[in-house]
Amino acid sequence: MARAKFLREKLHVNVGTIGHVDHGKTTLTAALTKIGAERFGGEFKAYDAIDAAPEEKARGITISTAHVEYESAVRHYAHVDCPGHADYVKNMITGAAQMDGAILVCSAADGPMPQTREHILLSRQVGVPHIVVFLNKADMVDDAELLELVEMEVRELLSKYDFPGDDTPIIHGSARLALEGDQSDIGVPAILKLVEALDTFIPDPTRDVDRPFLMPVEDVFSISGRGTVVTGRIERGIIKVGDEIEIVGIRDTQKTTVTGVEMFRKLLDQGQAGDNAGLLLRGTKRDDVERGQVLCKPGSIKPHTEFEAEVYVLSKDEGGRHTPFFKGYRPQFYFRTTDITGACQLPEGVEMVMPGDNVKMVVTLINPVAMDEGLRFAIREGGRTVGAGVVAKIIK
């Protein structure tokens, strides 16, 4: 094994299984780890080990998620699988497990079911960029025409939610047979075909460091003789001394120049995604900047007040509300580092939202916030989290 350490690390990609209950998501997850371990490295995780997913907390919400890993010839995959439908909803909305792509598992015997549709819709809303399909339980369908029909239905469903249905790779197979080591077309070879589809159809993810610079403002200090220092954790990109930046959100956008980058009281030439840094800003006064704004590459992000969101409302057991809320509900929306009050408009025909529901809503904030589609937020009442959401579409 000594020579393994000379190999350059494989590119890391995050994926997960989605689809209707009992269509075989967990069996497929087990098969991927088994065949990955046999061919490319990693370790086999049995069905029972994956199914007993531990509970974890993301933004105060308890979610059961199984995390497994497997490799292909060129990539290292981190894969999430959830035991229950509610866990998927929470996982996707909170972004607890960000996916670069998803594997939609659909039973060839049953065809698309309500959760198949809901998971595709959620993927669209929360910004899962790519989906590949595994048509499972193909051993239970003798009729080739029936298989084709199910495949057509799945493609139509994907197209309906703006995924490229016609171009999506759809692999027919049986996760159970593959786990048993079956070498027919729908056994082990189908899993290898699926991994190949992941390798080719899901593009290499852009690393945070390669995206335009953005840092949420956590604190602002004025240092006599030096000017104003803004601290925060750099969310993406790289910032160098001398770079021009914008201060966006809450008030009118301002431009300034970074004259110093500090980490742990040391001066640096640059800071990058993941760093906790202090940025010295030229000519900016202490009162010009406040928590809740962001520093960013000029023109890369705009302030907005109105957007469509996909929201999960915490149940009473999760510490959420005990009662439903109605249209005109005005909680605080916690974006990055600050709470901003906003009004909720519910979809037509929805009178109220119960704790434990997920719902699409239009939110109007009282102050503008720097946002992109895909930005996560918490919904709070007096500092207590009562929901989680994601910006699905910016309106203005």
Swiss-Prot record:
Residues 10-206 form the tr-type G domain. Residues 174-176 are annotated as: G5. Pfam families: GTP_EFTU, GTP_EFTU_D2, GTP_EFTU_D3. Gene3D superfamilies: P-loop containing nucleotide triphosphate hydrolases (3.40.50.300), Translation factors (2.40.30.10). GTP binds at residues 19-26, 81-85, 136-139. GO terms for cellular component: cytoplasm. It catalyses: GTP + H2O = GDP + phosphate + H(+). Its main location: cytoplasm. It is an enzyme of class 3 (hydrolase). Monomer. This is Elongation factor Tu-A. The gene is tufA.
